[in-house]
Structure formats: C-alpha cells, structure tokens
C-alpha cells in the first residue's frame, strides 16, 4: 500500500533529517496521482485536443492492424473529434463568476495594495480550478501568484484538512535539473535535483517571505530583517463537485463539476 503524505508525515521526515528525500518522494507520488493525470488531460482538452478520443482511435487502429496480420495500413485519426468547446465553456463559466472583479464588503479595503492585476489573477485561479478541480494562490509580498495543480503539490493536515505547506516544482526541459520550492508557515526553502545522479541539494536555505530594510536617517543601510505572515500565504481555490453529473464523462472532461468556484483554506 502506498504511503499517504500529509503535513504530519512531513513533520516526521523533517525531524528525522529526511526533508529533501521526502520532498522528492512526495512530488513523485503527486505526479502519479489521479487528479494530476486528469489535470494533464484537461490541459490537452483546453488546447483543443481530445486525449480520450485519441487513445481510443490509436487502440482501434492497432487492433485493426493486428487483425489484418499487419497488412492493413494505419487508420488515420480524424480531427473532427476535436473542438474548442471545453475551453470556450470554461472561459464563460470563469468570466460569469469572476469577470467583474473582486468587490469587498468592507469599504475600507484598499484594493490597490493587492497588486495591479489582482482581479486577473483571481480569474486565472478560478479558471484553473474549473478545469483541474483545484488551483492555488501564493501571496508574494505585494501581488498574487497562481499555481496550477500540475506544478504544485499541497500538504494538508490529516486532522483538520487545512493546507499547511506545499511544494512547487518545475523542470524546463527533460535534460535539465528539477527545481523545488518548499513553502511553510515560517518561510520557504529552495532545492535542486540534478539530472545526472538524481542528487538533491538545498540551493537556498529557509528565508522569510518578507524582507524589512532598516535605514539610517542619512540614507545608509542599517539592517535587513526577515518577516513572515501570521498565516501560510497560500490558499486553495476549489470547485465543489456536483454529484448529479456523471463523473466518468470523458469527452469533455471536468464538466461534471459545478460552476461554484470557492476560495478554500
């Protein structure tokens, strides 16, 4: 039985000095999970492709070739099964919910402090939540950054279900190094895994999310101090499942979810 990685198992690995190895194994499991694979398929549908029909047509063509004892030519796969309905529909759903921007009930909120493109980033988070099932927002000092499920592995508390930490990961090309950023309540740490030998090293030790620079009256630099937030600067944007829709619907994947986009802890 595979290990279920939670914030508690992360703390255990951290106490045992196995944090880098845990991060590698955790991300590997995330990339083999059902939600991650479905999110990859959703990206293909979003690009006006149809992976479900493509796989079926490939299997069908291979079956015909075997029945003909490899004498039959490959059956061409029709392009008519592809359309932009998936992207168009979800763009409309995201625009319907978030197209007018965010409005705060408290008139005292200074929205300008949230960044110039805050509304666009919220709409982006909502769109990825619609097609992937969930997305994640990271408050980076003075602006919002959106992470997709295909680039961010969340760590939830096994008792409360709350998001307590997470790992962002990326590799620019198959022949380049893998990069990780671990986000915790008390700061972030960067790691790099070499392509050759799979050696994982800490490239940036844990740093605070904010840097406070103190200067002298004359303008000289006196000190630079780190400061963190009172809570983890990450949030989950999820779409509540609608059980009345067929979960197994593959032709236009992810349409079984309702349009109720929610920001979740």
Show where each model-derived region lies.
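Extended, helix-rich architectural segments
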Residues: 1-144
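Intrinsically disordered, low-complexity, compositionally biased regions/tails
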Residues: 21, 38, 56, 103-105, ...
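Residue-level detector of alpha-helical hydrophobic segments embedded in or interacting with membranes
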Residues: 30, 46, 71-73, 149, ...
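Intrinsically disordered, low-complexity segments enriched in proline/serine/threonine
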Residues: 37, 53, 78-80, 156, ...
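Generic hydrophobic, helix-prone segments enriched in Leu/Val/Ile
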Residues: 43, 92-93, 125, 179-180, ...
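Intrinsically disordered, low-complexity regions of eukaryotic proteins
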Residues: 43-45, 81, 186, 192-195, ...
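Extended, Lys/Arg-enriched charged tracts that mediate electrostatic binding to polyanionic substrates
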Residues: 116-219
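Extended, charged amphipathic alpha-helical segments
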Residues: 210-265
């Amino acid at each position: 039985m595979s290990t279920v990685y939670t914030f508690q198992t992360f703390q255990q690995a951290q106490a045992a000095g196995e944090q880098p190895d845990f991060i590698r194994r955790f991300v590997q499991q995330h990339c083999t999970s059902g939600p991650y694979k479905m999110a990859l398929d959703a990206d293909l549908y979003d690009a006006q492709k149809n992976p479900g029909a493509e796989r079926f047509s490939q299997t069908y063509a291979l079956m015909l070739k075997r029945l003909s004892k490899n004498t039959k030519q490959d059956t061409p796969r029709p392009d008519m099964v592809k359309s932009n309905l998936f992207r168009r529909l979800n763009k409309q759903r995201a625009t319907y919910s978030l197209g007018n921007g965010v409005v705060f009930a408290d008139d005292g909120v200074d929205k300008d402090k949230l960044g110039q493109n805050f509304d666009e980033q919220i709409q982006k988070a909502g769109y990825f939540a619609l097609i992937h099932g969930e997305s994640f927002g990271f408050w980076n000092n003075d602006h919002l950054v959106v992470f997709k499920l295909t680039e961010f592995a969340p760590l939830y508390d096994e008792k409360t279900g709350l998001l307590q930490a997470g790992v962002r990961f990326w590799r620019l090309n198959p022949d380049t190094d893998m990069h990780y950023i671990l986000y915790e309540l008390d700061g972030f740490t960067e790691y790099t895994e070499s392509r050759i030998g799979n050696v994982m090293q800490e490239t940036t030790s844990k740093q605070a999310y904010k840097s406070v620079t103190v200067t002298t009256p004359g303008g000289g630099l006196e000190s630079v101090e780190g400061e963190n937030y009172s809570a983890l600067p990450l949030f989950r944007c999820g779409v509540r499942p609608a059980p009345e829709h067929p979960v197994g619907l593959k032709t236009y994947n992810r349409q079984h979810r309702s349009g109720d986009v929610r920001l979740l802890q």
